[in-house]
Amino acid sequence: MVGSALGRQGDRPVGPDGPGGPDHGWFRQGTIDLRKFERYLFDPDHPQNEGKAEGWRKVFDLGPGDALAAERLIREQIDQAEIVEQEPKGRYRRWELLIPDCVGPNGNVAPLLTAWALDPDNKLPHLSTSFPRPP
């Protein structure tokens, strides 16, 4: 495993209660449920999609059947992002990581927002949503 951009704790990822808070490695190891892409982020008919599917298609030319490519894109480029903790929602701690210059498989470059949540019963976060912002 590659260490964080800050190099804290060597090659071990640092979680939210470590010195300085979570590092990129902790998010890189987090859970990304591929069904979230297929059933929500890439589905324009999902009632809560709010244009996310159109953004993925227009910016990175990704859509149904491309969940693995989207996961790879996030995991490989998450180190560019600033880690910003958000207000907790219910029992979940939350973070936003904006990848400022995400390069899609089609070569397009655009900011990509990733949002993560941590269930207190788990050790790693899960991706809650993600969508590109127009360049």
Feature roles, as predicted:
Residues 1-100:
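Compact soluble domain cores
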